[in-house]
Regions:
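N-terminal, positively charged nucleic-acid-binding surface of large information/translation enzymes
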Residues: 1-146
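Structured secondary-structure scaffolds
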Residues: 1-5, 53, 58-62, 110-215
């Protein structure tokens, strides 16, 4: 067993919070790591094998390598996107994810999770062809019944995928706090696409020392 933990430090939420505290995003992230997250691990007596930050050079290197491979293989394309964006969730929302605001936000659509107004964003993005993987995933789940456990979650995910996967906007050009898209320096990678890759970058993906990843 190899226990990994760490911090997700990119995105608009960190950028805005840092600005509100008159510090750079990196300085704000450093404060959170050193004053809150690492001390918390000591408090709860967690004996993790590694701690990775998404601002670590090893993570950025691995993410860049992964992204470039997707692009070279034709799984990323440029397009226009407009949608409801929640800064708190750091993701675009469907109309069904919104509720009517109350109090100071009466008359506005707000995020059902954070109860704050969403922003309508329209920008040129790069998209990941997630729709290309719909049948591949269903075939994987069918041929490997134990791949997702428990069964209730497996059934939920299969039902979700069967509804149809849409291509995912994976870049932002309205701010610069993130990992730069390697073929277009005007864009940074969408925070969720970046952060989830820590599970493989911590194992050395994209580096010369990738024995743990290959194992």
């Amino acid at each position: 067993t190899w226990l990994l933990t760490g911090t997700d430090e990119h995105g608009q939420k960190i950028l805005r919070t840092a600005s509100a505290n008159d510090v750079s995003p990196k300085e704000w992230a450093d404060r959170l790591v050193n004053d809150a997250w690492k001390p918390l691990l000591d408090t709860v007596d967690v004996a993790n094998d590694d701690f990775i930050r998404t601002t670590d050079e090893r993570h950025e290197r691995g993410v860049t390598a992964f992204l470039q491979k997707l692009y070279d293989d034709g799984f990323i394309y440029a397009g226009e996107f407009e949608g409801f964006y929640c800064v708190g969730c750091e993701e675009y929302k469907q109309p069904s994810d919104l509720v009517a605001g109350t109090g100071a936000y009466e008359g506005q659509q707000v995020c059902a999770i954070h109860s704050i107004p969403v922003e309508v964003l329209a920008e040129r993005n790069y998209f990941f062809r997630m729709s290309d993987f719909e049948q591949r995933l269903l075939d994987l789940y069918e041929s490997n019944p134990l791949f997702i456990q428990p069964e209730s979650v497996r059934n939920e995910i299969i039902s979700f995928v069967k509804q149809g996967l849409r291509d995912l906007a994976i870049s932002r050009s309205s701010f610069d706090w993130g990992i730069t898209i390697p073929w277009d320096s005007d864009h940074v990678l969408y925070v969720w696409f970046d952060a989830l890759l820590n599970y493989v970058t911590a194992l050395g993906y994209g580096s010369d020392d990738d024995e743990a990843f290959r194992r």
